[in-house]
């Protein structure tokens, strides 16, 4: 046996007879220390896991320990700091009623097994970031009755198993957004008695999807904060506040709530449908408030409600509480005296509400102040059918064309009953067409009023047009009292007469966006209800010119169409600008080319063969007879040159001389101005008289030819 234990020993074996004294001592120590061998004490091993802190073998001097140091109590020791020698295997630590002011970072880092930490009734005013590091097993954290002014959101990091957080009775002034989103595992949150609380953010409770209990009692609340994120909340404490009015939607999203406490909350009025969201409510406490009556059938949607506390309220027993008496008789038939007593009138004072019946009162059916009216709309639009009474103590339900009874809180995708009794359509369809009946009920009976909803299909060609599209048209948007959300756009087209200058068109007139009555189009029903006419508005005036054309466009499409038209205009403008630039560039190129061609042509003409005219003495070329003839002809030409056309009588010359006659005449005219009306004598005075015969020699410099004159 000894040999077996030696094999399990961490000490190496030595040959028999050579075992030294220290090794024998270690062997004896190991054999006679079962706790160490089995790891039962585990102090040395656990201290290593605790971050290297010295092993805690005993309870701190200022505390008392039990259950092998797993439960440590240090209450009423006037401690200013958290003791540093708390055993590492502590699961429960109570530090209440001391003078601790600051919880420093990593104070509890070595207490990895701690489950409950109580720091209540101290002077804690500051909790440093990371103060609760190293507490992965912490389940409950109590910080009530301290001096915290803010919620220590950052300190809750890494508390992945925290289930309960107590912050009651601290001078906290505000609860910011996402104050507890670092501890989504919370099940119970106590924020009661925050008497200096002034502000709760709309997103203060975001992330608390597992919360089951919330205490907001005695926090001086004037309104119920946003609790929509608490989808699993089962118990809600709102007692001790100043909630004068409970509105519809105050408990939106709390479909799992089972218990609601509103004692001593100064509640004076609970509006119709205020509790409709509490489908799972089982217990409701409204005692010690200022309630005088409740809306008709307030508790009807609460199918699971079993216990209602209504005592200590100044109930005014009249027709408005008669329904409550009937409800109490049905809910608690064995004890109708459990809940409330009449405070007025004097004849019924002290009577239990559950004992009242209709014989005590003279009641009348409700009056509908604003009945619904017929409505004509186009498919896809929103619509409302109003049904209002003079008091909120009644209940309002709607009967649809297919026989469905619509109440407040009834789930429909597009249709709902608002808290004021209005039947709201978010997006009407053709199938919604039919007669809708409003039923207003109180203890004496009910009153009904009906209206017809006409839904016309959208015209695929002229989408948004009101049926006929003009006054008097019988389109789907007609009908007195029906509101269609259309806007009228008047477009003027001007025709220019021949000879008249076209004038600039006037600006387009628009009717301001908003509901316009269909009755103005003249297509409404003649038997429409009178109240509708009082709430109608006339359409914008339009010009009577025959060139004006009116188009009706839904305002829901104005923005989208305007943007689309703007894009088209921009594209067209860019195309026009591009074409203009291209044409300008081409014109410039053509102009430059034309200029260059013209310049080249002028240069070519300037450098062409030079023509010369040479006047020579005829005597050197012709015989005497010919010279005389030429002289005579010249004399005749000199006499007739002033009056008429000049003619040069040329003698009979040789054939080669006559071939150049026309050319000489043309050159002569070009040189002297080519005036057909005047003779050559007027242009050239040198030819008025010919003293000697002359010859013109014309031609190029290379070949000068002769012409006899």
UniProtKB/Swiss-Prot annotation:
What Gene3D superfamilies does UniProt report for this protein, alphabetically? Immunoglobulins, Ribonuclease Inhibitor
Signal sequence residues: 1-38
Q: Where is this region: Disordered?
A: 496-552
- Biased-composition ranges, Low complexity, are 528-544
Glycosylated residue positions: 226, 285, 335, 376, 402, 424, 427, 446, 454
Gene Ontology terms: cellular component: cerebellar mossy fiber; glutamatergic synapse; postsynaptic density membrane; presynaptic membrane
What the entry says about post-translational processing? N-glycosylated. O-glycosylated; contains sialic acid.
Q: Which residues cross the membrane?
A: 575-595
Q: Which cell locations does it reside in?
A: Membrane; Presynaptic cell membrane
Question: Which keywords does UniProt give here?
Answer: Cell membrane, Cell projection, Disulfide bond, Glycoprotein, Immunoglobulin domain, Leucine-rich repeat, Membrane, Phosphoprotein, Repeat, Signal, Synapse, Transmembrane, Transmembrane helix
* Membrane topology field: Single-pass membrane protein
Entry keyword Cytoplasm? no
Q: Which cysteines are joined by disulfide bonds?
A: 387-438
Q: Indicate where this protein is primarily found.
A: membrane
Superkingdom assignment: Eukaryota
- Does Iron-sulfur show up as a keyword for this record? no
Looking at the record, the residues that make up the Ig-like C2-type domain are 366-454
Binding partners and assembly: Interacts with PTPRF. Interacts with DLG4.
UniProt domain comment: The extreme C-terminus binds to the first 2 PDZ domains of DLG4.
Q: What function is annotated for this protein?
A: Synaptic adhesion protein. Regulates the formation of excitatory synapses. The trans-synaptic adhesion between LRRC4B and PTPRF regulates the formation of excitatory synapses in a bidirectional manner.
Q: Which PANTHER family match?
A: ANTIGEN BSP, PUTATIVE-RELATED, LEUCINE-RICH REPEAT-CONTAINING PROTEIN 4B
What is the protein named? Leucine-rich repeat-containing protein 4B
Gene of origin?
Answer: Lrrc4b
């Amino acid at each position: 046996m000894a040999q077996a234990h030696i094999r399990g020993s961490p000490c190496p074996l030595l040959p028999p007879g050579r075992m030294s004294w220290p090794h024998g001592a270690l062997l004896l120590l190991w054999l006679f220390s079962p706790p160490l061998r089995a790891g039962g004490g585990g102090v040395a091993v656990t201290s290593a896991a605790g971050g290297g802190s010295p092993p805690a073998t005993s309870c701190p001097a200022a505390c008392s320990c039990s259950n092998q140091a797993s439960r440590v109590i240090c209450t009423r020791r006037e401690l200013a700091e958290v003791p540093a020698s708390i055993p590492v295997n502590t699961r429960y630590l109570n530090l209440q009623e001391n003078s601790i002011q600051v919880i420093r970072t990593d104070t509890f880092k070595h207490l990895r097994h701690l489950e409950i930490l109580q720091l209540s009734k101290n002077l804690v005013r500051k909790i440093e970031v990371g103060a609760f590091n190293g507490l992965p097993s912490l389940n409950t954290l109590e910080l009530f009755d301290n001096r915290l002014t803010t919620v220590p959101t950052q300190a809750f990091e890494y508390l992945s198993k925290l289930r309960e957080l107590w912050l009651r009775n601290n001078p906290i002034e505000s609860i910011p957004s996402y104050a507890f989103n670092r501890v989504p595992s919370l099940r119970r949150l106590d924020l009661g008695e925050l008497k200096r609380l002034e502000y709760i953010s709309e997103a203060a409770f975001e992330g608390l999807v597992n919360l089951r209990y919330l205490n907001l009692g005695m926090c001086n609340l004037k309104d119920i904060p946003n609790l929509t994120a608490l989808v699993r909340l089962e118990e809600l404490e709102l007692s001790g506040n100043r909630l004068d009015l409970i509105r519809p939607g105050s408990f939106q999203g709390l479909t799992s709530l089972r218990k609601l406490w509103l004692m001593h909350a100064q509640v004076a009025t609970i509006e119709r449908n205020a509790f409709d969201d509490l489908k799972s409510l089982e217990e409701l406490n409204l005692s010690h408030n200022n309630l005088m009556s409740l809306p008709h059938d307030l508790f009807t949607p609460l199918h699971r409600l079993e216990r209602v506390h209504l005592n200590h309220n100044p109930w005014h027993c009249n027709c408005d509480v008669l329904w409550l008496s009937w409800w109490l008789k049905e809910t608690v038939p064995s004890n109708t005296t459990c809940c409330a007593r009449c405070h007025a009138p004097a004849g019924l004072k002290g009577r239990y509400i559950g004992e009242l019946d209709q014989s005590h009162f003279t009641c009348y059916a409700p009056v509908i102040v604003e009945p619904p009216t017929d409505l004509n709309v186009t498919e896809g639009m929103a619509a409302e059918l109003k049904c209002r009474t003079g008091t909120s103590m009644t209940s309002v339900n709607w009967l649809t064309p297919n026989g469905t009874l619509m109440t407040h809180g009834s789930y429909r995708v597009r249709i709902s009953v608002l808290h004021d009794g209005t039947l709201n359509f978010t997006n009407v369809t053709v199938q919604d067409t039919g007669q809708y009946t409003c039923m207003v009920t109180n203890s004496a009976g009910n009153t009904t009023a009906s209206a017809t909803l006409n839904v016309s299909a959208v015209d695929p060609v002229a989408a948004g047009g009101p049926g006929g599209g003009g006054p008097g048209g019988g389109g789907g948007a007609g009908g007195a009292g029906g509101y269609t959300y259309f806007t009228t756009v008047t477009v003027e087209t001007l025709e220019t007469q021949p000879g008249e200058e076209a004038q600039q068109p006037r600006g387009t007139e628009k009717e301001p966006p908003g509901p316009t009555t269909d009755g103005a189009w003249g297509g409404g029903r003649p038997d429409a209800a009178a109240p509708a006419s009082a709430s109608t508005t006339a359409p914008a005036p339009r010009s009577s010119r025959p060139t004006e054309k009116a188009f009706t466009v839904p305002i829901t499409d104005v923005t989208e169409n305007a943007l689309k038209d703007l894009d088209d205009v921009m594209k067209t403008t860019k195309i026009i600008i591009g074409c203009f630039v291209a044409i300008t560039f081409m014109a410039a190129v053509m102009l430059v080319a034309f200029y260059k061609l013209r310049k080249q042509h002028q240069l070519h003409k300037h450098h062409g063969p030079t023509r010369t005219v040479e006047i020579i003495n005829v005597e050197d070329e012709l015989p005497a007879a010919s010279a005389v003839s030429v002289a005579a002809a010249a004399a005749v030409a000199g006499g007739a040159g002033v009056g008429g056309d000049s003619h040069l009588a040329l003698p009979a010359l040789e054939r080669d001389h006559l071939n150049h006659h026309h050319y000489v005449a043309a050159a002569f005219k070009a040189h002297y101005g080519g005036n057909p009306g005047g003779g050559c004598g007027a242009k050239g005075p040198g030819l008025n008289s010919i003293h000697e015969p002359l010859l013109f020699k014309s031609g190029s410099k290379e070949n000068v030819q002769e012409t006899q004159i």
